[in-house]
Design a protein with these regions (language model features):
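Bacterial N-terminal signal peptides
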Residues: 14-23
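Alpha-helical scaffold elements lining the catalytic groove of polysaccharide deacetylases
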Residues: 629-633, 637
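Proteolytic maturation boundary segments
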Residues: 27-57, 170-245, 249-250, 257-268, ...
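N-terminal secretory signal peptides that target proteins for export/translocation
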Residues: 1-9
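M16 family metallopeptidases and their MPP-like homologs
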Residues: 53, 58-87, 99-153, 158-164, ...
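Well-ordered alpha-helical segments embedded in enzymatic catalytic cores
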Residues: 394, 636-640, 788, 858
Length: 879
């Protein structure tokens, strides 16, 4: 059997054949994962493929897509201009669109353009995508099918020879995902398709793998002043189309993810050992699911320019170690477990967007990608029974087939260093790794001393937690546990939610608050560096994260439900056996200025600028400002955590899992006395947050046109107001998106209902320029000021904005369905239970009834308040 034409394919063949499972059916001589039952596929009489997805998580809405396997380079007589022109023409006026452009038809029913507009043309495909179309009226569905078929039928009436040759119905697929009945939709499309005759399909260019025997080095300009970046990319041959729906891509993707985790961790460790500060270390890979060309694996490292030569040596030495088979077996086992645990958590979160379904179906049509659910893939991958030694051998085979200092390698770097020197430094360090001696100190669970517990019976007050339908246990010390029982994939999730955030730290500089969480782990925990402690618990299947916000601190994670003793011991050790690690702090603070420079100009910085204009005197911002980072922050953070962890009764430990409550309580109770408590509760500091009144506008010059608008208004956060605010944000998003259609701008609307320091509704609109290629030929990119005029027209009319009852009802269904799905996520319950205990807010109890009571008038009332609140506009006009 021909599997692939290089050593990489041979390296993967063995694990593929070893991993047969009952969840698969056999095809193409390799096991095929069972397709998602929610996806109905077929071929219409005229040859057009179809994919219909019934998605119960999104009510009243659907995504419509048309996928064509014609792009800018996969047909014999194409050019990028021809393919793009054909795509834009398809969004214009067609015979069945009643004299208006296709994009206007979909926009009139709520369709929102993506970041590429309504269409994207790639090397091998053209993908039209209309997001969030409101389909509550049956005639909308019928009209949408007619329009899509009209787009398919252009081939039969086109005078353009390019269109008539390369856009046959058989070269196209219609995808519908949303609140639809798949069987009914398929039948309707079949009836309509009889109006469109089949046309012969022309053959496409075949993929050809081109091996490179020597590396290419490219010197590129610096993107950020003073920061030099080194990127190594290995091109890999594609997975043959016949095997794309088999288990091979899933296995290969897992191995590449593990390879990236290994390289990233080893590079970071190497840079730290040599005291080389870094701005970024990341690995990535592109598979045949994501591209029509070669697959690839990449490593990127960004450092200060004067450290660049040394960083190149570290990167090459790490890559050489992995190539020569020096990956540690315990490191690989830990990373595999972490990777699978992350995937299992995603399975518990069943809120699949229509867009995700559209992408999966498009990949199936274009590349023969698998239609299997994530759960099916995870069950298969987690069900593998391979010894760690076998896993390591297979990993080493794949790694050595990919990594090479010359073959199929392209290096791009941005530093004032001659190419020959870069190449020599890289090659020499790689070769040096052949004699690597691993003297790394690796800790294990045996290095974590278990806690000595007193088996003393205590009286526990038990009552029902009505919001979660769980149990609340209160111990004599005042320590509280809330347990929510639900399916959790064999895990026990925990969240120690405490009153006390960075606003309680005295003399905190503006821009320091966002750093506080990191200092929890810039310590030694249980006698070892915190980083090593986290590796030890990760190897045992446990995670632990810390997030300190403005007024609360959350210490959360998960562990195997059969390992509760390890979970509780490790949590308590992390809380009370911490010591400041001066070396870790010093290195961290040397990296932060570089990371800050790398963040410059990003979306977070833009949001921070707008918020700073809105409330200039507010110093408790979450955005990180390295220039404000003081040497005293480490001690302040240490003292802060020591203080709040002595008052754990001023909070709640939330547990979410599927153990019998009596068994859990018996197991957990001996550990409760180890949590320190106090008779004095935490006092929230007085934090002044008063946005400037009125409407302010700031204009600057930049690289590309963009608009950011922030709006803030006081709002009593009752459950009724919370639901109405959610619906109002959806209405505003729809109205703005509709108004902006044809301007060439892409809208992102975010909002938050803020409880502290005062109850408010905050909205943020971000408009970014999209290429005209993503819209109809009638679309001409508006300038920033023209787009701003459109936004102002909508926002200035919020007091009297037209709000249809149809939209409100659809969005109510959408909100209800979204909350129902979120409740299957353990983190949802940890968040809402902590909010009720720490902030006294409950938006979950009777949520269905609360949503039902939202009216058009209530939504208008929320929008009217926005008209009265604070507004800031930040406009960037391209130079």
């Amino acid at each position: 059997m021909v599997f692939m034409n290089n050593s990489l394919g041979k390296s993967i063949l063995l694990p593929v054949m070893m991993l047969l499972s009952s969840v698969m059916v056999m095809a193409q001589n390799l096991p095929v994962l069972t397709p998602d039952k929610a996806i109905k596929t077929g071929t219409l009489p005229n040859g057009t493929s179809y994919y219909i997805v019934s998605n119960p998580t999104v009510k009243g809405l659907a995504d419509f897509a048309l996928v064509q396997n014609t792009g800018v380079s996969n047909v014999t007589d194409t050019s990028s201009a021809q393919a793009v022109s054909a795509a834009r023409g398809a969004l214009s006026v067609l015979p069945r669109t009643s004299g208006r452009p296709v994009q206007d038809f979909f926009a009139s029913h709520g369709a929102i353009p993506g970041k590429d507009g309504f269409v994207k043309v790639t090397d091998n495909a053209t993908q039209f995508h209309f997001h969030d179309v409101i389909i509550s009226k049956p005639e909308v569905l019928d009209s949408a099918f007619l329009v899509l078929m009209d787009m398919v039928d252009r081939v039969s009436r086109a005078d353009d020879g390019f269109i008539s040759r390369w856009y046959a119905p058989a070269d196209q697929a219609i995808v519908v995902a949303g609140d639809v009945d798949a069987a009914s939709v398929a039948e309707k499309m079949k009836m309509i398709s009889y109006m469109i005759p089949p046309v012969p399909s022309a053959p496409r260019k075949e993929y050809v793998w081109e091996q490179k025997d020597s590396a290419s080095y490219i010197c590129a300009p610096q993107v950020h002043d003073g920061i030099a970046t080194f990127t190594a990319v290995w091109n890999l041959t594609r997975t043959p189309r016949a095997y794309m729906n088999t288990v091979q891509p899933a296995i290969y993707d897992l191995f590449l993810t593990e390879l990236g985790m290994v390289v990233e961790e080893y590079v970071k460790t190497g840079l730290r050992q040599y005291r080389i500060p870094y701005a970024e270390v990341k690995c990535g890979h592109v598979t045949s699911m994501q591209s029509s060309g070669d697959e690839s694996f990449s490593v990127t490292v960004s450092v200060a320019e004067d450290e660049f030569p040394y960083a190149v040596g570290v990167v090459a030495e790490v890559l050489g170690r992995v190539d020569f088979g020096y990956t540690d077996i315990s490191d690989l086992a830990r990373m595999k477990r972490t990777c699978l645990d992350d995937m299992k958590l995603q399975v518990l979160r069943p809120m699949f967007s229509n867009s995700e379904y559209v992408e999966r179906c498009a990949t199936s049509f274009l590349h023969n990608g698998s239609l299997a659910t994530l759960k099916t893939k995870v069950d298969f991958l987690a069900g593998r029974v391979l010894a760690d030694t076998t896993e390591l051998r297979l990993f080493n085979n794949i790694s050595s087939a990919i990594l090479d200092p010359e073959k199929n390698l392209t290096v791009t770097y941005s530093a004032a260093m001659p190419e020959e020197q870069v190449k020599n430094a890289f090659s020499n360090a790689w070769a040096f790794a052949k004699d690597f001696k691993d003297d790394t100190k690796r800790y294990t669970a045996a290095d974590v001393e278990p806690l000595e517990l007193e088996n003393v019976k205590v009286k526990v007050v038990e009552k029902t937690d009505h919001m979660s339908n769980g149990l609340e246990w209160t111990f004599p010390s005042g320590f509280k546990i809330v347990y929510k029982r639900m399916p959790a994939g064999g895990k026990m999730y925990f969240n120690l939610a405490l009153n006390g955030g960075y606003s309680a730290i005295g003399n905190l500089a503006k821009g320091e608050g966002g750093y506080v969480s990191d200092y929890f782990k810039l310590t030694r925990i249980g006698g070892m560096p915190a980083e090593d402690f986290m590796k030890v618990i990760a190897a045992a299947g446990m995670s632990l994260d810390v997030h300190t916000g403005l007024n609360t601190t959350m210490i959360s994670g998960s562990a195997d439900e059969g390992d509760l003793d390890f979970m509780m011991s490790s949590l308590l050790i992390a809380l009370y056996e911490r010591r400041k690690d001066d070396e870790a702090v010093k290195y961290y603070e040397s990296c932060e200025p570089l990371r800050s420079a790398l963040r410059a100009g990003g979306a977070d910085e833009m949001t921070a600028k707008v918020n700073d204009i809105m409330c200039p005197d507010y110093k408790y911002v979450s955005y990180r400002m390295a220039e404000r980072l003081s040497p005293e922050l480490a001690d302040k953070a240490m003292n802060f955590y020591d203080t709040i962890l002595k008052k754990t009764n001023d909070g709640v430990l939330i547990l979410v899992g599927n153990l019998d409550p009596s068994v859990l309580k018996k197991k957990i109770s001996p550990y409760v006395d180890c949590f320190e408590t106090s008779d004095v509760a935490f006092r929230k500091p007085l934090v002044r947050y008063q946005p400037a009144s009125g409407w302010s506008t700031y204009t600057v010059e930049g690289e590309r046109n963009s608009i950011d608008v922030a709006m803030s208004v006081p709002l009593a956060l009752t459950a009724d107001n919370f639901m109405a605010a959610e619906i109002a944000a959806m209405v505003l998003n729809k109205n703005l998106s509709k108004a902006l259609t044809g301007t060439g701008m892409y809208l992102t609307l975010s909002h938050e209902c803020r409880v502290y320091p005062n109850e408010r509704l905050n909205l943020h609109l971000a408009l970014n320029e999209v290429s005209e290629d993503g819209f109809s030929v009638e679309t001409v990119n508006a300038g920033a000021m023209e787009a701003l005029a459109v936004v102002r027209k909508v926002l200035s009319g919020t007091d009297g904005m037209e709000v249809s009852s149809e939209d409100v009802e659809v969005f109510k269904l959408r909100l209800k369905a979204a909350m129902e799905q979120e409740m299957k996520d353990p983190y949802y319950w940890m968040n809402v239970i902590s909010r009720r205990h720490l902030a006294g807010k409950d938006f979950t109890t009777n949520y269905q009834a609360r949503i039902k009571t939202v009216t058009v008038d209530k939504v208008k009332s929320i929008l009217s308040k926005l008209e009265e609140g604070s507004k800031v506009e930040y406009i960037v006009i391209s130079k």
